[in-house]
Amino acid sequence: MPEVIFNGPEGRLEGRYHHSKKEDAPIALILHPHPQQGGTMNNKVVFEVYQLFAKRGFSTLRFNFRGVGRSQGVYDEGLGELSDAASALDWLQSANPDASQCWVSGFSFGAWICMQLLMRRPEISSFVSLAPPANKYDFSFLAPCPSSGLILHGSEDTIVPKESVAALTQKLQEQKRIKIDYRIIEGANHFFHNRIGDL
């Protein structure tokens, strides 16, 4: 799990990278929760998802948004963080020019950024969105959603009500040419405490 440093829009960004031994391995980018609420690339959910992708043969990158850890810059209300994610994906693609697929995943705030990146990068083939904060952020830009994916949500999440995630999921499931798998993790709260293994 080597440490990597790559250029972002506002300076250096730090990450952790797992490189698959297979030349045409798929790639996955993992995005962390809100930088101003303690979110980092070392978040337990982010780390677990990173490990799961790596175990499935993906070349996988997780990184700190601007102003977090050793990443340069300051929080930018999501706009700059989306640019950071695009730079991270550029770096990941340059390290894996023969990748067979491109996936993105995000947790909470990271899920919101992940879905915006999905709209801007047609090479992204699928996504995994964990506890997308549909009660706090506008997801109407997903019209239409360009790729199939998975939405995970805890049944006991008190930060993001299940009604808001269910409504978002239903809107996506009504769209043609994509498949959205919606799974509720029973007993899990917003942070999937004691349920991370169920992911």
Task: Identify the residue ranges that each predicted region occupies.
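N-terminal cap/lid segment of alpha/beta-hydrolase-fold proteins
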Residues: M1-E23
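Short, surface-exposed "cap/lid" segments of acyl-processing enzymes
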Residues: K21-N64
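Alpha/beta-hydrolase active-site loop
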Residues: V45, Y75-N96
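Alpha/beta-hydrolase fold nucleophile elbow
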Residues: N96-F107
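Gly/Ala-rich beta-loop-alpha elbow adjacent to hydrolase catalytic centers
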Residues: G106-C114
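Short beta-strand/loop motif that positions the catalytic acidic residue
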Residues: C145, L150-H153, D157
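Acidic catalytic loop of the alpha/beta-hydrolase fold
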Residues: E156-V160, H190-F191
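C-terminal catalytic histidine-bearing segment of alpha/beta-hydrolase fold enzymes
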Residues: Q175-L199
